[in-house]
Each structure stands twice: as structure tokens, then as C-alpha cells.
């Protein structure tokens, strides 16, 4: 990693790495789908922790051997969020090459299986019934559902499916549709011909949101939680922000500084 993780982030990374390895082992012993639930408050740097996890899976660490043929699929509900996550991985995870990160495109993606050693970015809009990815024809050999099902069948020992439930771009009815699509990967979908993903890593800001996502599943759930107190102790979260109202002549300059600081904070820690 190009950045030094905070102590609580290192603890979370070690915990998620252990539980992900346990989940993969359990799946191959029992063939029961596994879910690793990673919950951390907004501002904890969840995407940075997940970037470090992907790097650890692909290149190994002190506890686990490298798995260079691992396949990671990252699902969110927004192409913009996918792009932000992809850029975060590129800028923070120095061992992962940009060429390993692939945005699944409606126009050009058509594969029997996902390729080893890559991180694929999907969003729920591309999985709707109207999406070209979900339909045969127009020169397409494989639908995205067929690609997923084939990969589970042939490469279940190295497939990790990340659901980014923490950063939601959709609201209202569209958010509900996105949740329904996300649940297909946890529960499977007979109508789409896909089984549950072997190992799902769910990233969420609250336990309530994640519980809603996994409601009704039979998957074994492994939980990893970062508390607000841990993040606050690191200095990333503040108890209070004091705002004063200066004389009119100084307002514009001060607000410009405040806006710049807020923009920098958002860029570093929102994802």
C-alpha cells in the first residue's frame, strides 16, 4: 500500500483477511455459501481497507500465501461509485496494476468466465433486464449471468464477490431495485441461472443496512465490525465542529478555506 493504515484499519484488515480465508475454506468443506460482513462508520476509510484486502489476497501477507489467480468482483449501485473505488485502488494499492482493474462494459464485455488475477467492477444498472449485458444477441456470446455462473462452476476456489452497500448512489425506488439485484448474488437467482456466490464480502456503514441485505439468506455470516469509538480515537472522526460567524468582510475567505478543507476530507475518507 502507498499509505500507512491507521491502527484500527490494520486490525480490521487482519480480521477481514482471516474471516475471508475461513469463509473460503468453509465453502469448500461444506459447499454452503459464505458471507463476510464488514461494517464501519462513514469516515473510517472502508474502501482503503478493502483495497488493502484485495492486495493481500493477490500478493499475500505475513499470515497467508499469495493467490495471484484470485478473481475479485466489486458491485455497487452506481458507475460513478465504481470509478471512485477503482481510482482509489489505483492510487493507494501500489502492487495492483491499473490493467488488472476492469470496468465491465455493456458494449465490449463478453467472456465465458472472468479472467484470473483481475478486479472487475459492476454496477446494478448494468444488471437490469434492459441491459445489453443480460441479453443474448447483437453479437453477444455470453450474458453476464452466464459469465458469473461459469466462473462459480469453474473457479469457485478463487472467486471473491464484494458488495459495496456502504456507498449508495441510488435513492427511493431505484435504491430498492439495486438492493434486490444485490441480493441475487447472496441468495442466487433461478430466473437468471446463477447460484449464490461462494464468498461474498459485504461492506456497509450500519449493521441495519447489511441485515436488510442478507435477510432470508441461508449463508453462514462472519462479522467484522469497526466501532465509532475506534475511528474517533484515531482522530478521523470528531465529536464536535465549532462554527463561528465572523464579520462580513472575512466571511468569503473563511468559507473558501472551509470548503477546500471539506473537499479534501471527502476525497480522502468518504470512500
Please tell me what each predicted stretch does.
Residues 3-32, 123:
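N-terminal pre-P-loop "Q-motif" helix
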Residues 3-16, 42-52, 81-82, 172-178, ...:
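Phosphate/oxyanion-binding active-site loops and adjacent basic polyanion-contact surfaces
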Residues 27-53:
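Walker A/P-loop
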Residues 48-52, 64-97, 125-126:
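Conserved Walker A/P-loop ATP-binding site and its immediately adjacent core
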Residues 78, 122-126, 165, 203-207:
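A short beta-strand-to-loop transition that corresponds to the Sensor-1 phosphate-sensing loop
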Residues 105-110, 117-162, 170-185:
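Conserved RecA-like ASCE ATPase "motif II neighborhood" in helicase/translocase motors
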Residues 171-234:
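Post-DEXD/H (motif II) to motif III coupling segment of the RecA-like Helicase ATP-binding lobe
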Residues 212-271:
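Conserved interdomain linker/interface between the two RecA-like ATPase lobes of SF2 helicase motors
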Amino acid at each position: 500500500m502507498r499509505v500507512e493504515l491507521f491502527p484500527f484499519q490494520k486490525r480490521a484488515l487482519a480480521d477481514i483477511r482471516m474471516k475471508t480465508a475461513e469463509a473460503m475454506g468453509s465453502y469448500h468443506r461444506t459447499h454452503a455459501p459464505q458471507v463476510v460482513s464488514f461494517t464501519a462508520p462513514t469516515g473510517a476509510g472502508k474502501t482503503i481497507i478493502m483495497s488493502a484486502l484485495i492486495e493481500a489476497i493477490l500478493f499475500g501477507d505475513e499470515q497467508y500465501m499469495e493467490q495471484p489467480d484470485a478473481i475479485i468482483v466489486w458491485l455497487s449501485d452506481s458507475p460513478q461509485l465504481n470509478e471512485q473505488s477503482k481510482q482509489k485502488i489505483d492510487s493507494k494499492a501500489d502492487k495492483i496494476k491499473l490493467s488488472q482493474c476492469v470496468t465491465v462494459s455493456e458494449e465490449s464485455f463478453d467472456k465465458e468466465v472472468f479472467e484470473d488475477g483481475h478486479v472487475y467492477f459492476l454496477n446494478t444498472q448494468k444488471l437490469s433486464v434492459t441491459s445489453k449485458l443480460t441479453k443474448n444477441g447483437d453479437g453477444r456470446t455470453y450474458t453476464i449471468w452466464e459469465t458469473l455462473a461459469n466462473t462459480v462452476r469453474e473457479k469457485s476456489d478463487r472467486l471473491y464477490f464484494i458488495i459495496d452497500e456502504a456507498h449508495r448512489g441510488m435513492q427511493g425506488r431505484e435504491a430498492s431495485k439495486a438492493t434486490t439485484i444485490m441480493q441475487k448474488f447472496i441468495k442466487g437467482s433461478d430466473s437468471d441461472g446463477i447460484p449464490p456466490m461462494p464468498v461474498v464480502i459485504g461492506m456497509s456503514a450500519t449493521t441495519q443496512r447489511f441485515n436488510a441485505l442478507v435477510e432470508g439468506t441461508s449463508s453462514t455470516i462472519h462479522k467484522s465490525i469497526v466501532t465509532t469509538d475506534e475511528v474517533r480515537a484515531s482522530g478521523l472522526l470528531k465529536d464536535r465542529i465549532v462554527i463561528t460567524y465572523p464579520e462580513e468582510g472575512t466571511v468569503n475567505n473563511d468559507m473558501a478555506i472551509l470548503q477546500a478543507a471539506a473537499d479534501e476530507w471527502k476525497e480522502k475518507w468518504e470512500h
